[in-house]
Amino acid sequence: MALLCSALSNSTHPSFRSHIAGANSENLWHLSAHPAQKSKRRCNLTLSSRAAARISSALESGKLKPWQIPKRDWFPPEFTFGAASAAYQIEGAWNEGGKGPSSWDNFCHNYPERIMDGSNWDVAANSYYMYKEDVRMLKEIGMDSYRFSISWPRILPEGTLEGGINHEGIQYYNDLLDCLIENGIKPYITLFHWDTPQALADKYNDFLDRRIVKDYTDYATVCFEHFGDKVKNWITFNEPHSFCGLAYGTGLHAPGLCSPGMDCAIPQGDALRQPYIVGHNLLLAHAETVDVYKKFYKGDDGQIGMVMDVMAYEPYGNNFVDQQAQERSIDFHIGWFLEPMVRGDYPFSMRSLVGDRLPFFTKSEQEKLVSSYDFVGINYYTARFSEHIDISPEIIPKLNTDDAYSTPEFNDSNGIPIGPDLGMYWILSYPKGLKDILLLMKEKYGNPPIYITENGTADMDGWGNPPMTDPLDDPLRIEYLQQHMTAIKEAIDLGADVRGHFTWSLIDNFEWSMGYLSRFGIVYIDRNDGFKRIMKKSAKWLKEFNGATKEVNNKILGASSCCSGELMWFLVQNPYGK
């Protein structure tokens, strides 16, 4: 097994001991580590070569044989299959129903040039008015669960409890929950999916200030209080790694901050420090919220966790330094937020390389952080190669040089791509990577219960390779889902505790800085025909996979007062309820 300690030793890689790395990083770890962890101090470990080599012929060969195509009965009856979405990406009604403005409202309206197609989410998929159609699609496809997010400024328009609760927003989510439950669909709620109340950005720069911890905890408590009788599965934060890096490092996402001289909406930030400050405050808000939930709202059957965005990593070349770069890529991508919840502090490599720019936890904060999850959510799409880079005075320090590895290449040192190109520029299909990540969670992080909370690929409007002629014909998505479900099954057979899979996404939506150019939905949204929902071939395959027959669905939906045919017709004809 490769040891990170050896990569950071005085004799092996002096480039790591640069001005960026702290001179006494191991002592820093001892000062900050949770007492229960000090007796267990170890270097970070990779998967053993034997474990990494356990690749099935199904994942190696690319296309699955007919007998390798996954089936529902491969998985335990209690294994959940669902689809996912996010409030900002689908709801629309950006200034209706008492909702306050969000950071993304501000970003899209004031910096439209930062969205590739110049669009915004003002209407999005119109789900605020057409949520019953979304539930109908879930039911018809046979999904047993739905992961969606609550818009913080729709609940607290000013971002704070003192600013008042918006009861129209409470009613909207209660109506959605009632509709889901009536149709036998379990809700999984994400409390924060990147749409920070703009009022908090104006008041104190939102997640850059510790006051966010109290305000977020207050917001989460309002949600527990009003929806807790209907919701047993909670997620505090979605993809903190992406949130910190894209919103406060590169500025590609709202609020759009980056360092002076960089190309972003607001080049008045500090890309070397602010992402770590935001991540630290986010972890503190998570810990406080979980503490409140477990003390007052969890009961016997509730559970709460955080969702991590992960990539799989392979060494760029067959050499020691690239293998260590692979280690660091895992630390900086997954360990940044998971290790504080497992052992009470950031990974040793981060303490070493980021130095005093990485905040410290107090003892009481560590005590709340450790074991502050009942499950871990994993969003997995693709993989990269990790290549070591030397840290030297000639390199201009920035967020993506802190980790001393580079992952811009889709190809390895021999020019071999990590997987097939699916048309979406950043997604190359690599199902083996999902299996490897799940086994890594088992061997390195104590095998926590895991839900695959996002997994899917996108169609590209005008960017496809080759371009799509029929938006409903998505064979690459079907193949992608089949291969990744097979990878999950193989990881389960090797002992990984995986409990569910959510396809991203249920419907085509507003895809952040890409606007509407990329379509991740298994259901097509016809924006020229009243936002009509139409199942793609992938949805029809999932319907068959789930064993949902047309006769059963029609019978159930026909009896549903929530999603009756008359209501559906009215909503399609009158999307704004007029």
Swiss-Prot record:
Active site: E239 (proton donor), E454 (nucleophile)
Subcellular locations according to the entry: Plastid, Chloroplast stroma
Catalytic activity: avenacoside B + H2O = 26-desgluco-avenacoside B + D-glucose
Keyword entries, A-Z: Chloroplast, Disulfide bond, Glycosidase, Hydrolase, Plant defense, Plastid, Transit peptide
Cellular component GO terms, alphabetical: chloroplast stroma
Superkingdom classification of source: Eukaryota
Pfam families: Glyco_hydro_1 (PF00232)
Cysteine-cysteine disulfides: C258-C264
Keyword Transferase: no
Main location: plastid
Entry similarity comment: Belongs to the glycosyl hydrolase 1 family.
Subunit-level organization: Heteromultimer with P60A in a 1:1 stoichiometry. Aggregates to form the fibrillar stromacentre.
Protein name: Avenacosidase 2
